[in-house]
A protein has these predicted regions:
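Short, low-complexity N-terminal intrinsically disordered segments enriched in polar/charged residues
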Residues: 14-61, 160
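A short gly/proline-enriched turn/hairpin at secondary-structure junctions
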Residues: 67-77, 88-94
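Short, solvent-exposed loop/turn segments at secondary-structure boundaries
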Residues: 71-73, 124-127
């Protein structure tokens, strides 16, 4: 009888663990959920700083040796090259960007994001929209801040 009660007790503990683990993973204070929220917020911050023309703050979003590869353009390697490219392009308040996140994976201090992007900009008398897919790799700095390490944006037929 004692063995039976012990088995029932252990079985109950196992069942409780099975039930509790998913709720712990979904909890609002779960570090992964917090990181995902921070990363999604960075997409909005990028657009805000792009519109602001504050190139120094804009560049604070990138790692020192970041790589940016834009559709049909040579890769930009390092902050200096990225800044040189964006310096004359940012500050356009009438540009809008939307991200449709398809996948966000976090592995310790690295986050990988795949998203469809839509960039709206004025062209002559109308608004043009360019769509594509982004692969963005974020690295967490020593200060705990997520920074863009790799940003690859390409036009894709399913994002128009």
């Amino acid at each position: 009888m004692r063995s039976y009660l012990l088995n029932q007790f252990l079985f109950s503990i196992i069942i409780l663990k099975i039930i509790m683990v998913p709720s712990v993973l979904l909890a609002d204070n779960n570090p992964i959920n917090t990181d995902i929220l921070e990363i999604k917020t960075l997409g909005k911050k990028w657009l805000e700083l792009y519109r602001s023309s504050n190139i120094e703050k804009f560049m604070d979003l990138y790692t020192e040796d970041a790589l940016v590869a834009l559709n049909g353009k040579p890769a930009l390697k390092g902050k200096e090259a990225i800044q040189a490219y964006f310096a004359s392009r940012i500050g356009k308040k009438n540009v809008d960007m939307r991200l449709d996140y398809e996948k966000i994976s976090i592995y310790q201090n690295t986050a990988i994001v795949v998203a469809k992007f839509y960039l709206d900009y004025p062209f002559e008398e109308r608004i043009e929209t360019v769509g594509g897919r982004s692969l963005i790799v974020y690295k967490k700095s020593d200060l705990g801040k997520w920074l863009i390490d790799v940003d690859i944006d390409q036009k894709t037929p399913d994002a128009n």
